[in-house]
Amino acid sequence: MDQEPSERPLPALSFRHVDPHAYPQGVAFLDGQFVPMSEAKLSVLDYGFLHSDATYDTVHVWEGRFFRLDLHLERFFGGLEKLRMAIPFDRDGVRRTLHDCVALSGHRAAYVEMLCTRGASPTFSRDPRDAVNRFMAFSVPFGSVADAEQMRRGLCVVISDRVRIPPASVDPAIKNYHWLDLVRGLYDAYDRGGETALLLDFDGNVAEGPGFNVFAVKDGRLATPAAGVLAGITRRTVFDLCRETGLSCEAKAVSPADLRQADEVFITSTAGGIMPVTTIDGAPVGDGTVGPLTTRLKDLYWQRHGDPLWSTPIHYPQ
């Protein structure tokens, strides 16, 4: 039988937290210091943790080069402005910080994040104006939404009935950590034998998935949802590649039926690039194999990673 609080001695108060968890190898920056990922700590009183009051952006490094870094910086600073947050760095300062995280980590292929939380209030006030905004960054090994086997055969996607948070509530242009709708959609997909999920908008059209946009190909023409979605950098890159190669690509309403009847479907994310989808709700997309246009765009996408107009080199220590 448990003792009453008045009958048992209090536990000892520790003055240093010992973290038993494992973390990926990498380097983080916070409070002016570059530290191993295992030492990158956030207060439990930070509103970023308590209220998901934060914005972030993620850029990847491939073969020692950032890909489209300026576009990610532009989106990150746009989110800061909309959320009325301020950090002690301009874009060049953030660029240098991200570079140094990668260079110190030694990663040639990396997932690199910049983020700002609302921070903590010294008095635990609920007024967000009292909080001290906190900027952080980190570099960890590159990861993909789709693994090598899924890239080869294509992903199995389930269209969840969950509705994505509408733009009237949270501007999708602000990259954020409001993922509970996406996480519930993922569990819907797992329960139905899928590997990842797509959510709907309030009109019943397809919106986006957990960290990715989606494209449908029909009769050689591409379409991607226009409303209520993050304007992903990889999504934008697909538009750029289509423009260069003369392919038709349009942002418009895409219904679940449009996806199911498409010749090809693929998803796009910084975490993986252009990734094929060959099954939706248990039924094959087209002939059930990775489509030629998806393959063509995927190959072009990775080829552009060495283009100095689209990429920035990392200067690693000798």
Show which residues each predicted segment covers.
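Conserved alpha/beta cores of soluble small-molecule-handling proteins
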Residues: 1-198, 202-205, 230, 239-318
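Secondary-structure junction motif
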Residues: 234-235
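Glycine- and Gly-Pro-enriched alpha-helical subdomains that act as flexible
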Residues: 198, 205-226, 231
